[in-house]
């Protein structure tokens, strides 16, 4: 289904009386609204910028409470955040971060009263903010997630069930059924989609493979990846690691991972192997249907910096890319 067909379909079902959807922002976070201390250091050195990074506003804290591991906002990103806070009717973070990682954002800075939904884990989960339990996010000094913190977020159960159990069809949820059709249309060439169901993929399979590669090429690539043994793969739905060199990923590796049901995401030294059905654009499409958001009548802005952001940005009225983005290199 191309974008023109999607938009035409949206026009038919749009409720012009909607008071909720006026200006909506779907935004990636890392490298879009803030950047890591390390990446800023490299950029500032390359561009002759003498700003002390530690004086810039903190966008997100790290789990080890190390200042040099925090993420910060340059002035132009801070102005974008201020605009979103002040002008958007709805701000929906669309991130590869887990919910726990999302909760390390500096919410004293990101004081979003228009934050009602969060897309995490690259589209696997959609969370609803429960405003009755207090403010979103943990404090700077105490970021341990309490039971009250956990109650701040309510998972969209229908979406989570589709991601976790693999069933496409839900006759009681027309938005979900429509999204399932959209996913199938977008994924015609993918062997994982058949008989109106997702293939239920066991991500542990990749862990078993990683020490027993079938060829020298695969072994030479994967031996340069450091996997996190403590990562909750079943929860996140994807496998995260770091590469020790900057070599281009051979096409044979992409093909091999495709056969296993994964696509490869890479940003600088970070690499992730993500199931093909776990994509930001699918979650964005579902929310747009559920909330009656229309990219023709409403102002829908998509912000992102990486290849995995492009497709959800294409569902929006405008796509915005920050400077120093991978998409501009």
Stretch-by-stretch model annotation:
Residues 6-11, 15-93:
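Active-site neighborhood of HAD-like aspartate-dependent phosphohydrolases
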């Amino acid at each position: 289904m191309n974008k023109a067909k999607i938009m035409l379909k949206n026009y038919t079902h749009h409720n012009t009386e909607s008071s909720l959807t006026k200006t909506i922002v779907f935004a990636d976070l890392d490298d879009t609204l803030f950047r890591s201390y390390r990446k800023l250091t490299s950029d500032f050195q390359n561009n002759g910028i003498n700003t002390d990074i530690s004086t810039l506003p903190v966008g997100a804290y790290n789990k080890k409470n190390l200042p040099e591991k925090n993420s910060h906002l340059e002035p132009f990103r801070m102005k974008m955040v201020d605009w979103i806070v002040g002008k958007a009717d709805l701000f929906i973070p669309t991130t590869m971060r887990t919910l726990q990682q999302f909760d390390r954002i500096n919410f004293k800075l990101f004081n979003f009263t228009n934050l009602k939904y969060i897309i995490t884990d690259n589209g696997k989960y959609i969370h609803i903010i429960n405003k009755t339990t207090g403010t979103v996010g943990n404090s700077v000094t105490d970021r341990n997630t309490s039971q009250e913190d956990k109650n701040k977020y309510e998972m969209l159960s229908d979406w989570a069930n589709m991601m976790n159990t693999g069933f496409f069809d839900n006759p009681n949820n027309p938005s979900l059924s429509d999204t399932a059709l959209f996913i199938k249309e977008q994924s015609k060439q993918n062997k994982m989609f058949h008989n109106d169901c997702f293939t239920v993929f066991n991500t542990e399979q990749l862990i078993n493979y990683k020490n027993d590669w079938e060829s020298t090429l695969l072994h030479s690539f994967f031996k340069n990846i450091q996997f996190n043994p403590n990562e909750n793969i079943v929860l996140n739905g994807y496998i995260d690691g770091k590469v020790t060199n900057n070599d281009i990923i051979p096409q044979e590796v992409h093909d091999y991972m495709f056969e296993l049901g994964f696509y490869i995401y890479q940003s600088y030294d970070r690499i992730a192997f993500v199931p093909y059905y776990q994509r930001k654009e699918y979650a964005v499409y579902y929310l747009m249907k559920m909330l009656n958001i229309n990219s023709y009548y409403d102002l829908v802005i998509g912000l992102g910096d990486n290849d995995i952001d492009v497709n959800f940005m294409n569902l929006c009225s405008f796509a915005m890319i920050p400077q120093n983005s991978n998409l501009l290199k």
